[in-house]
A protein has these predicted regions:
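Contiguous mid-protein beta-loop-alpha structural module that forms a pocket-lining wall or clamp
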Residues: 96, 101-200, 204-208
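Solvent-exposed amphipathic alpha-helical surface segments
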Residues: 18, 55, 150, 213-217, ...
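Mid-to-C-terminal catalytic/tRNA-binding core of tRNA(Ile)-lysidine synthase
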Residues: 188-280
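Hydrophobic/aromatic-lined pockets within catalytic cores
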Residues: 78-79, 148, 210-214
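Core alpha/beta nucleotide-donor-binding catalytic domains of modification enzymes
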Residues: 1-145
Length: 281
């Protein structure tokens, strides 16, 4: 965006006054429409990770607030997700070896703006948030005002909803860990043992299995993918193959099943030193 240079100059000047170092990166391929929100997020967090390693930092604070959490939950409810996905953004999470903290998650944007104005702290407005081209912005502009009219503290309800789901998923995770010890053999799913569990536990196990593989990219998967994964495991076919997003291949063979990254063959050149030409006449 053309406004990026102005925003960068603003942040640079402000931090210089406070004697706080600034790390700034431009990502050339980060163009509108080229990446989904999830892919763009992955690019940003990978860069954050590199900076943390460069400065030997193991904690990263982000500015996510309560409205971000509400928007994320609503987006996932509309698109479909897992129980963990519906919980939205966590106050504490982990990205590889870095701990992510979100200290503003209990405050909404209006409260943050109020604090900035009261303390005479300058800020800039991100104009890309004004467009309704993205579903997150449409939720922000059209749905959140309706929720605020019904309950000015709607965001606190979404925060409580998120925390409740996280508590429940933690309990489920404890049970899943027991199932994994029984069902996983050399990181492969023993289908006969898998079938011994209730449908609810099978579903929870599959959600966890896919999450452990996709991690931050779990939003690439929908409820449809989970159902396909379940049906392949429980189906009568002894041998089955299916391609999942991001080049993961489901393989079912000889009573076991697993996901693996598709192997890509890199282009190569081989020079023939001795050869024979056959005349087909």
């Amino acid at each position: 965006r053309k406004e990026c240079e102005e925003e960068y100059a603003f942040v640079k000047n402000y931090l210089q006054k406070l004697n706080i170092p600034l790390v700034y990166y431009e990502i050339d391929s980060y163009e509108k429409g080229k990446f989904t929100e999830s892919e763009a997020r992955q690019i940003r967090y990978q860069k954050f990770l590199e900076v943390c390693h460069e400065y030997h930092a193991n904690i990263l604070l982000t500015a996510h607030h309560a409205d971000d959490l509400t928007e994320t939950i609503l987006m996932r409810l509309l698109r479909g997700s897992s129980l963990k996905g519906y919980a939205g953004i966590k106050q504490v999470s982990f990205y590889e070896d870095v701990t992510l903290l979100r200290p503003l998650l209990t405050r909404n944007k209006k409260e943050i703006y109020g604090y900035l104005k009261k303390q005479n702290i300058p800020f800039v407005h991100d104009k890309s948030n004004d467009s309704n081209d993205y579903i997150r912005n449409r939720i922000r502009h059209e749905i959140l005002p309706l929720l605020e009219r019904e309950n000015p503290y709607y965001y606190q309800k979404f925060l409580s909803f998120s925390e409740l789901l996280q508590e429940k998923t933690n309990l489920i995770d404890e049970e899943i860990s027991k199932v994994k010890k029984d069902v996983l053999v050399n990181n492969k799913i023993d289908i006969l043992r898998f079938k011994n569990y209730s449908k609810a536990m099978q579903n929870a196990f599959c959600e966890d299995y896919l999450y452990q593989i996709y991690q931050e990219n779990i939003t690439k998967l929908t409820k449809k993918h989970l159902n396909i994964f379940m049906n392949l495991l429980l189906g009568k076919k002894e041998n089955a193959y299916y391609e999942f997003p991001m080049d993961y291949l489901f393989i079912k063979n000889e009573g076991y099943a697993f996901l693996k990254k598709k192997e890509t063959i890199k282009p190569f050149c081989y020079s023939l030193e001795d050869y024979l030409v056959l005349d087909d006449k």
